[in-house]
């Protein structure tokens, strides 16, 4: 009798993607994050669905509907905490996933990489519109500041901003639109994830050494299903610890106050996962220049494949490039810290220096390091 998973049209797709998939025998725990991101997406869609059943996207009732979810709905507090902290876990896994891609040269699978960057942008858009929904002080002022950036675009800026607002300022129409976007975007993300996997399975996974692994492959199940299960346990443990013991530690206290257009928050800032880009935006005095720098900082992964100069794919045996990548990591942490600080000295100058270093590292220093490492590898006799 033929095995059903190998003959059934639907089961066959699942089988080729998750069971009999040939995977390199040497991929490390850094390759866990793809499956963890899939789990995060499922958690967000499920918790979001239950929250949407009780949420009302109206400026008069949005804030109280979130309070109602936490007070009156069975386990509503848990669903909300899982959803809010699930977003933080999602971005943490995403940054590690992208970092692994840069370290091991996975960006040379250009189609997979480009879809990944589009996924990153879509996810950032989803998180931004989602942050506006509770209609607290920081939600309102965050939406006002970020959407106002569109007005810096010459000629069409003001029209574009008013189109996004659905009014002449952030108001009821904005909230309704953002709720609609926040509901539909995760399903678009799911479709993009399928395309991401489709392109990945065309080439097969990269591996730490960066060399062709075709001569030594093992089936994904049971080896990597077990390995991924360990990462999954760590993810769920961290998420539940956050959601149950310290659910508001990553949020902003201002969001416990209902939105008030007449009272501006002293320091408007987005969620922690956007702070690095926000710091780059703030470091440039010109509004248009800041918007362009913000866009460049997020879109820069698109050109990383074209800046690869090294003969070796992975950074595993390239100590200079490794050092530069860790400096970039420290730089991003510095930018995240600066993004959460008030716009005053010494934070302004630190932010400006960190912003310059961010672009210098990616555009100049890392490609030069690759060329230097090529030279060092050449026999000198």
UniProtKB/Swiss-Prot annotation:
The protein's required cofactors: heme b
Residues bound to heme b b566: 97, 196
Protein known as: Cytochrome b
CDD domains in the cross-refs: cytochrome_b_C, Cytochrome_b_N
Gene name in the database record: MT-CYB
Similarity-based family: Belongs to the cytochrome b family.
Cofactor binding summary note: Binds 2 heme b groups non-covalently.
Binding residues annotated for a ubiquinone, in chain numbering: 201
UniProt keyword terms in alphabetical order: Electron transport, Heme, Iron, Membrane, Metal-binding, Mitochondrion, Mitochondrion inner membrane, Respiratory chain, Transmembrane, Transmembrane helix, Transport, Ubiquinone
UniProt subcellular location: Mitochondrion inner membrane
Assembly: The cytochrome bc1 complex contains 11 subunits: 3 respiratory subunits (MT-CYB, CYC1 and UQCRFS1), 2 core proteins (UQCRC1 and UQCRC2) and 6 low-molecular weight proteins (UQCRH/QCR6, UQCRB/QCR7, UQCRQ/QCR8, UQCR10/QCR9, UQCR11/QCR10 and a cleavage product of UQCRFS1). This cytochrome bc1 complex then forms a dimer.
GO biological process: mitochondrial electron transport, ubiquinol to cytochrome c
